[in-house]
Amino acid sequence: MNRLVLFVVAMGICAAQGPKIFIVSDMEGVGGVNNADEQLLPGQRRYDESRRLLAGEVNAAVAGALEAGASLVVIWDGHDSSRSLSIDDIHPRAQLIQGSDTPPDYYLGEKLYDGIMFVGQHAMAGAKGVLSHSQSFSVQNIFLNGQPVGEIGQVAAIAGQFDIPVIMLSGDQAACDEVLTLQPKAETVAVKRLVGKTSTLSLSHAEARLQIQVAANRAVKRISEFKPWKLQTPVEMKIEYYPGAAGVLATTLNHGESKQVEPRTVVYRGRTVLEVYQHWLTP
């Protein structure tokens, strides 16, 4: 999800004809997905199964949002460089953003959204969740203004800069718990939970889709109740890498605005959270 900032920049004020919803999808939080060696990347034995399960959960969220009066639902495929969803698979009334190299100017245009939903979301690195990580399995911790965040918090902070709230999340139980620390009123659906070191207990796909559709419907109907999560400015982001991630760290240090403050720690600073992420993601 390294390019997530580019897909949340285009947030704005409420639409007149009905809420416009932006869905961030990922795969590690989908029900039934628990094996990084078999289910997460193209060519792996069960990857096609994971794609099918992801599409089902995403489409359930789309259906629920539309039933509640959403005028537009745009999905960003946030897994594996936007290669996990196909336009053949998504709800016919949804739109799909794909491609990690999409020009940033496209997302800095006039597209406006009223709420963000997460589908298939995992918890931050270090959390006791299913396949928990932050951007990559090389990152140990990420802090925004001293607060630990994962991908959920990063999206929430960027959206908050544009006064857009997170309204719903589906994923594993740890991800649901995480979003509620930032948005206590968010609708959540825990489609699975960790029951061992790597084993999970998941809802059936049919039940997961039903609960996601209901939650998305409720979230859109309640959209006026949600407040964005805002960071004080200026903003500092600190990234701590695991030992052995020297190659990733070296690549990060090629970014002109970074500062290495400890052997495994890099800091970025900016006037806004968006500026900080542009420093991080722009080589």
Locations of the language-model features?
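C-terminal accessory domains and tails appended to enzymatic cores
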Residues: 73, 208-283
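Mature N-terminal segment immediately following signal peptide/propeptide cleavage
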Residues: 17-35
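Short beta-strand segments
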Residues: 24-25, 76-77, 116-120, 169-170, ...
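A glycine-rich helix N-cap at a beta->alpha junction
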Residues: 92-109
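Sec-dependent N-terminal signal peptides
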Residues: 3-13
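Alpha/propeptide regions of enzymes that mature by internal proteolysis
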Residues: 41-76, 82, 93, 215-222, ...
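Active-site glycine-rich loop that binds ribose-phosphate moieties when present
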Residues: 137-162, 171-174
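Active-site rim beta-loop-alpha module in soluble metabolic enzymes
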Residues: 158-166, 170-217
